[in-house]
Design a protein with these regions (language model features):
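Short, glycine/acidic-enriched loop or turn micro-motifs at the edges of active sites
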Residues: 17, 70, 94
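Short, basic/hydrophobic alpha-helical segments
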Residues: 43-61
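Short, well-ordered alpha-helical microsegments
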Residues: 72-77
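Anion (oxyanion) recognition and catalysis
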Residues: 81
Length: 166
């Protein structure tokens, strides 16, 4: 087990609407966790974290990567950051170029988890999601909600004006 403490663990998570897939590889390329499916809810998140906690030798030896995808992964990212995991949201363009380098051109959720983990492993530096980033996500969401509400209010005022003219 000499040198085992320098081992980094890279977790790739493929995000989808209802279910996500995750796998883990070591910095020497060994598959530590075969791809498995978990639900996009608290039960699924707890399943994931229990598997991750059994892998990590040290708190800083595990890095989680996932592609930036709409809003489907937001709750998972919040959960993982709140659980003090290091989470890195990857640009899909980077994973796409890694996918092109893959010998097998198949695109499945299970294969994508490895590609995401390998993309993470090849990074020179990481930008981890912080609590500040989560606050910014909330602020953006509130801004979009405000814009939508103002638009709806304007539409209703116009309808009200039309009805009062008649």
């Amino acid at each position: 087990m000499k040198g085992r403490y320098n081992l980094m663990i890279y977790v790739g998570i493929d995000i989808a609407k209802l279910n996500h897939f995750a796998s883990a590889i070591s910095s020497d390329g060994e598959i530590l966790m075969e791809p498995f499916k978990f639900t996009n809810d608290a039960d699924g998140f707890q399943l994931l974290t229990s598997k991750l906690e059994s892998l990590a030798l040290q708190d800083d030896s595990l890095i989680i990567g996932l592609e930036s995808t709409a809003h489907y992964g937001d709750n998972l990212v919040r959960y993982l950051v709140a659980s003090y995991f290091k989470v890195c949201v990857l640009n899909p363009i980077k994973t796409s170029s890694m996918r092109k380098n893959n010998i097998r051109k198949t695109k499945t959720d299970k294969v994508d988890t490895y590609i995401i983990a390998k993309t993470l492993m090849m990074q020179d530096s990481y930008r981890f999601v912080s609590f500040y980033d989560l606050d910014l996500m909330d602020l953006k969401q509130l801004g979009r909600f405000r814009q939508k509400t103002i638009k709806q209010r304007t539409r209703l005022k116009i309808q009200l004006d039309r009805k009062s003219v008649v």
